[in-house]
Amino acid sequence: MEIIQNVFNRAENGDRIMISFPDMLSFFTVTKWLNEQFGNPLWILWTDAAVERLNHLGKKLGYPVSGNAVTIGAIKECLFLDVVARYDFYDDVSSLLKSLPVGNVLLISFGVNFLEIFGQGLSKAIEFIIEHENGILCTCTVGEAPDILLPFHDTFIEIKSGEESYLTYKSYVAKLRFSVDGGTIEMSDSFLVSE
């Protein structure tokens, strides 16, 4: 996880990082590590699907079980996180960002790729990203990252399942892509996760 560690250690206030995950296990592993490094993040949960996924992780794997969350377009109850604000899809996102508790260094936005399942476009998520100014925003998707979101982030990390898996461990590859002098550079590293 050296690439992820380096990106977040160099991140500054106002930076936007996007990470796509192949599955919930890799999402759990990386977000738990981020929590250990930066303290409890402020979770921005898009739709009931995001709330359900975090409830499931909390029950099954014991994380996240504390911290604050803001829900957008969700009515489902967060079992482990304290919901400090609830917003509808039609609410003003700029006022949402101004009302967020600024004590959190890290904001984890999760569930933007679930918006289309609920009949919503990505415009509110893009508006949220554009209006973000304080803290480090980490937009997390499980499955394919919507290409339309990539230009609105400073860094994109794609995590894929690795080829070397063992009975009790699963391997992942983190790929960092960035543009330099008209070309693209890709760096990657591997890490193992206990199943």
Swiss-Prot record:
It comes from the Archaea. This is Uncharacterized protein AF_2147. It comes from Archaeoglobus fulgidus (strain ATCC 49558 / DSM 4304 / JCM 9628 / NBRC 100126 / VC-16).
